[in-house]
Swiss-Prot record:
Involved in pre-mRNA splicing. Belongs to the SLU7 family. GO terms for molecular function: pre-mRNA 3'-splice site binding; zinc ion binding. Its main location: nucleus. The lineage of its organism: Eukaryota, Fungi, Dikarya, Ascomycota, Pezizomycotina. The keyword Cell membrane does not apply. InterPro entries: Slu7_dom, Splicing_factor_SLU7, Znf_CCHC. Keywords: Metal-binding, mRNA processing, mRNA splicing, Nucleus, Spliceosome, Zinc, Zinc-finger. It comes from Neurospora crassa (strain ATCC 24698 / 74-OR23-1A / CBS 708.71 / DSM 1257 / FGSC 987). This is Pre-mRNA-splicing factor slu-7. GO terms for biological process: mRNA splicing, via spliceosome; RNA splicing. The keyword Zinc-finger applies.
Length: 416
């Protein structure tokens, strides 16, 4: 009886020897033999140099496991960058940073605070070495935001959501049994989510929007019930005028997407805008135009009056400080006719012969202190500035009046 045929699967999965390795030519990246792969695919071609060279493996693009291992090692290398390689040394060694004492960088590249006397001179407070990896990244890897992401960081997000869930349950007052169910059973615990799934306005949806229409809203095709009123334009997909000419509907709109702004429409628009802006500023929902129109109207008028009072007060202050100029009325401006008077301008663009305007000073004008009747700098004598009212050369001094002038003249005569 002939012997049974050899088990080709066992022979294929058996560990090849060094000679088999050279014969098959799978290279260092070879993981396992597959009898179903033809020899012209599994063997390296003759023009690939080095059977033990990983870079010469022509089947490297089929090694998905090797690529995953390389990506994992690369991610680990990225996460390890910047960490301490071990405990710090107690003595400065040659080649270390002269500022902090760590290896791997020079003094000009050190990110520590510059010391007056570095670690090379003092030998104190030597920092530990940092892990420096030369990671070669491709075009996409350099722009991958999750290349050095640690999945353990997502636990912080999970904990935050758990805290929010606990706060929500505490707010709802869920009383749980030791079995982890609600007070009325397992269905009571999920009663809060039952209506969220059925409705379009769930509490957990980020894009919650009411699709309901208010009771006062009336469709435009119902404003005028005349059979010839609704004129539809198929190109614009809108009603042309809906017959709004002289009936009740004409007071609401004239044409499509056009509201009449006559009457109290402008005041209504201001009140609505004020209510919206007040809610955005303070978050107070009590100022609602439909729910509480009186409070919003009172506050709006109060702020308007305060704003107008501030404007008038500011105008009066400017008028008292700088004066006012006569305003030419419209009727007088119309009576002024154009003239043919010849006007000549100079190089600066100013009218020749016109009186020069005195520029306003940036300092306070006509402010008298310490009983003075003139400002500092109104008197000049002996190359010194002073007050003209008392001839005093001491700034911020108290005014002495005529007695000070007489004393100043007497002192000048005594000096002469």
């Amino acid at each position: 009886m002939p012997p049974p045929p050899p088990n080709r699967r066992e022979q294929a999965t058996a560990a090849p020897s060094s000679t088999d390795k050279s014969e098959t030519g799978a290279g260092a990246a070879r993981k396992e033999d597959n009898i179903y792969i033809p020899s012209y695919i599994s063997k390296q071609p003759f023009y690939v140099s080095g059977l033990d060279n990983e870079e010469g493996d022509s089947l490297l693009h089929q090694r998905a496991r090797q690529q995953e291992e390389d990506k994992a090692a690369q991610a680990a290398a990225l996460l390890a960058r910047g960490k301490k390689a071990g405990p710090a040394r107690t003595k400065w060694v040659k080649g270390a940073c002269e500022n902090c004492g760590a290896m791997g960088h020079k003094k000009k590249d050190c990110l520590e605070r510059p010391r007056k006397f570095g670690a090379k001179a003092t030998g104190k407070d030597i920092q530990a070495d940092r892990i420096v990896r030369d990671v070669k990244l491709g075009y996409e890897a350099k722009r991958d935001v999750y290349s050095a992401y640690d999945p353990k960081q997502y636990m912080e997000v999970v904990e935050e959501y758990n805290m929010l869930e606990e706060a929500r349950r505490a707010l709802q007052g869920d009383q749980k049994t030791p079995d982890g169910e609600g007070a009325d059973g397992p269905e009571d615990d999920k009663s809060g989510f039952k209506y969220d799934e059925e409705s379009d306005m769930g509490r957990d949806r980020a894009t919650t929007k009411q699709s309901m229409r208010i009771r006062e809203d009336t469709a435009k095709y119902l404003l005028n019930l005349d059979s010839d009123s609704a004129k539809y334009n198929p190109k614009k997909r809108a009603l042309v005028d809906a017959g709004a000419i002289a009936d009740k509907s004409a007071a609401l709109f004239a044409e499509e997407s056009f509201l009449r702004a006559s009457g109290e429409a402008a005041e209504f628009e201001k009140a609505q805008r004020y209510a919206w802006e007040a809610q955005e500023r303070s978050g107070d929902t009590s100022l609602h135009l439909q729910a509480n129109p009186t409070a919003g109207e009172i506050l709006r008028k109060k702020e308007s009056e305060e704003r107008e009072a501030k404007r008038r007060k500011r105008a009066e202050e400017l008028a008292n400080q700088y004066g006012t100029q006569p305003v030419i009325s419209d009727a007088l401006r119309e009576t002024i006719k154009e003239s043919e008077t010849f006007v000549e301008y100079d190089e600066a663009g100013l009218i020749k012969g016109a009186p020069k305007k005195v520029g306003k000073s940036k300092y306070l004008e006509d402010v008298y202190i310490n009983n003075h009747t003139s400002v500092w700098g109104s008197w000049w004598s002996d190359f010194r500035w002073g007050y003209a009212c008392c001839h005093s050369f001491v700034k911020n001094s108290y005014c002495t009046g005529e007695a000070g002038i007489a004393a100043s003249e007497k002192a000048d005569a005594w000096d002469k």
